[in-house]
């Protein structure tokens, strides 16, 4: 179970870095928010889900 948590934490870190780079680039385009609103919201919801899943799994490991 510990290895699964470690893999999930690494995936969360990588996903966070991708969002840190991708969201500002997407929003800086001419039609940024209106064109990419659903993608940004979906990616953000996925990130929140990963954070919650990591927290739940951490409660079982610790």
UniProtKB/Swiss-Prot annotation:
InterPro entries reported for this sequence: PSII_PsbZ, PSII_PsbZ_sf
Alphabetical UniProt keywords: Chloroplast, Membrane, Photosynthesis, Photosystem II, Plastid, Reaction center, Thylakoid, Transmembrane, Transmembrane helix
Transmembrane intervals: 8-28, 41-61
Bilayer disposition of the protein: Multi-pass membrane protein
Subcellular location: Plastid, Chloroplast thylakoid membrane
Record-level GO cellular component terms: chloroplast thylakoid membrane; photosystem II reaction center
GO biological process: photosynthesis; photosystem II stabilization
Domain of life the protein comes from: Eukaryota
Subunit structure as annotated in this protein's UniProt entry: PSII is composed of 1 copy each of membrane proteins PsbA, PsbB, PsbC, PsbD, PsbE, PsbF, PsbH, PsbI, PsbJ, PsbK, PsbL, PsbM, PsbT, PsbX, PsbY, PsbZ, Psb30/Ycf12, at least 3 peripheral proteins of the oxygen-evolving complex and a large number of cofactors. It forms dimeric complexes.
Function: May control the interaction of photosystem II (PSII) cores with the light-harvesting antenna, regulates electron flow through the 2 photosystem reaction centers. PSII is a light-driven water plastoquinone oxidoreductase, using light energy to abstract electrons from H(2)O, generating a proton gradient subsequently used for ATP formation.
Protein name (database record): Photosystem II reaction center protein Z
Gene source species: Cyanidioschyzon merolae (strain NIES-3377 / 10D)
Gene for this chain: psbZ
